[in-house]
Amino acid sequence: HIGLHRLPPLLRAFTRAYPQVSLDIRFLDSEVAYDEVLHGRAELAVITLAPQTAEPVRAMKVWDDPLDFVVAPEHPLAGKADIRLADVAGHPAVFPGGNTFTHHIAQRLFEREGLTPNITMSTNYMETIKMMVSIGIAWSVLPRSMLDEQVVSLPLPGIQLTRQLGYIVHRERTLSNAARAFMALLDAERGD
């Protein structure tokens, strides 16, 4: 998701400013990228941030990424008013994989309400989740930035889900000039 929806303008700016730099870019699940930085196999990762970050990893939030409950336009909950979380929980859901930070964010919301979502399938790819929702198989939680006419947002009064996107580095690792330059672009995005 980040690689398709957040990084392109930053990568464009970076490659224009530093055309001589050869980038080593790997598109990984956030949890895998976190592990790569933690174990020194990557110096910087732009990821969905973990709810808690353990030393020696340092996390910097760049974007708030609001999440919406979504269904297909023809789903029984589409267009209904006064929908409760319990109503949503009773319908089949497609969730991000159980090991993902986004899954844990949504799961905690249901647990706080004493509910269990009816998760019938999962995948780590947001675009696949959107497709499954759009054809009416299930509801899900998607980043607001992905919403279009293929899916309908469900109004759930009093419920707001947000995940944080940003970058992580290893505190005990010396970063390359290229990594520091890219961090400066990311910091400019967050207003630093």
What are these regions (language model features)?
Residues 29-42, 48, 99-152:
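Hydrophobic hinge/microswitch elements
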Residues 1-54, 119-123:
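Central regulatory/effector-binding core of bacterial HTH transcription factors
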Residues 15, 51, 58-61, 77, ...:
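Short secondary-structure boundary/capping segments
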Residues 58-68, 139-144, 151-165:
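Short beta-strand->loop
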Residues 49-50, 73, 143-146, 165, ...:
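Short secondary-structure boundary segments
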Residues 54-67, 71-93, 177-179:
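Flexible hinge/capping segments at coil-to-helix
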Residues 155-192:
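A late-sequence structural motif
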Residues 48, 78, 91-113, 175-184, ...:
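Secondary-structure junction motif
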